[in-house]
């Protein structure tokens, strides 16, 4: 199992979340929105590993400098905070200097997509949104329905939610009172 920790300075829970990870010796910690050496060192101290979400080369370089164990390339089409680079170009760029494990995410939803990710050079294909609608998911039923009923036309790439660009569904933005003029 793993835990995702957003390490951006606006996340006031980082230290508390990290302490829980240490207490329970969480084997995999996924970080995003900042690469923090202290967090990596702490997770490594109990034998855990850290993978870091990246959308650009400079993010990968920073994560590599702090000693992460692998990178998650969050490419165009990924849900939530995501980049605009297509998977083919980003994986080629990152593999040109990075030799540790690479996970590819973004628009991966079936076996063909997984095979394509592996063919491009990813070590692992990462599907997230696809699993929100499984019966084991604790996601809100209205959220599950929104995903099922939405189309590609409902995906909005915007920074209006957190200040960091990401892909969000139009109905979720509208439910937050964020209308098209703010996208």
State the predicted function of each range:
Residues 1-101:
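Active-site entrance/lid segments in N-terminal catalytic domains of soluble metabolic enzymes
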Residues 53, 106-107:
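Conserved acidic functional residues
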Residues 87-103, 109-183:
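Conserved active-site-proximal phosphate/metal-binding subdomains
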């Amino acid at each position: 199992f793993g835990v995702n920790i957003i390490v951006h300075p606006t996340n006031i829970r980082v230290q508390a979340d990290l302490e829980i990870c240490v207490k329970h010796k969480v084997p995999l910690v996924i970080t995003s929105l900042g690469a923090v050496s202290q967090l990596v060192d702490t997770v490594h101290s109990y034998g855990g590993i850290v993978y870091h979400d990246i959308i650009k080369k400079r993010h990968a370089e920073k994560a590599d400098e702090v000693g992460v164990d692998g990178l998650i390339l969050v490419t165009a089409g990924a849900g939530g905070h995501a980049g605009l680079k297509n998977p083919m170009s980003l994986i080629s760029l990152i593999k040109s200097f990075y030799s540790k494990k690479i996970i590819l995410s973004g628009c991966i939803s079936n076996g063909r997509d997984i095979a394509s990710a592996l063919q491009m050079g990813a070590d692992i294909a990462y599907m997230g949104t696809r699993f929100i609608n499984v019966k084991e998911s604790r996601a809100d039923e209205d959220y599950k329905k929104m995903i099922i009923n939405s189309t590609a036309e409902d995906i909005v790439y915007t920074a209006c939610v957190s200040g960091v660009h990401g892909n969000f569904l139009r109905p979720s933005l509208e439910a937050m009172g964020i209308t098209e003029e703010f996208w």
